[in-house]
C-alpha cells in the first residue's frame, strides 16, 4: 500500500467502522482518535452524516450522536462532498453505494470497511477506489507517523 507523506490521506469510513470507533473503550478507538488528531481527512456527504447520526443514536444515545457529529463537522480535516453521479457499483448492498460515490467525488484514497461486499471495489478499474480493512488502515497511519 502506498503511503503519501506529502499529503494527508483522504478516506471514507463505512458507518459500522465509524460507529465501532467512537466509544473510548472500544478496541477501535484509535481510528476516532486519529481523526481528532488530524492524521487523515474524513470524506462525507449529507447522506453519510445522516446515517452516522442515526446508527450512533440507535447504538448509544442521541447525546453521543450529536457530540460525534459536532466533532466531525467542526473539524478542519473534514471534506464535505456532493454526489453528482450514482455509480451503483455495489450490487450486494445498494445502500452502500453512497460511500463509493462520496469517495469518487472527494477523490478519496480509500474506503475503510469490514464489510466483504466492498471487496468488489478492488476489481473496479474506473473509477478506481480501494477498499481496505481497519487493520490495514491502521498500518498506513503508523507508517505515515514514521515518515
Predicted features along the sequence, with ranges:
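Hydrophobic/aromatic ligand-binding patch that stacks against planar heteroaromatic rings
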Residues: 34, 102, 123
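Acidic, PIN/NYN-like endoribonuclease modules and their adjacent C-terminal/linker elements
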Residues: 116-147
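PIN/NYN-family metal-dependent endoribonuclease catalytic core
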Residues: 13, 23, 29-57
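A secondary-structure boundary/capping signal
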Residues: 14-15, 44-45, 114, 133
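Metal-dependent nucleic-acid phosphoesterase active-site entry motif
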Residues: 1-25
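Extended, non-globular alpha-helical segments
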Residues: 46-73, 140-147
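Alpha-helix capping/helix-boundary segments
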Residues: 17-18, 48, 117-118
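Active-site neighborhoods of divalent-metal-dependent phosphate/nucleic-acid chemistry enzymes
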Residues: 77-111, 116, 120
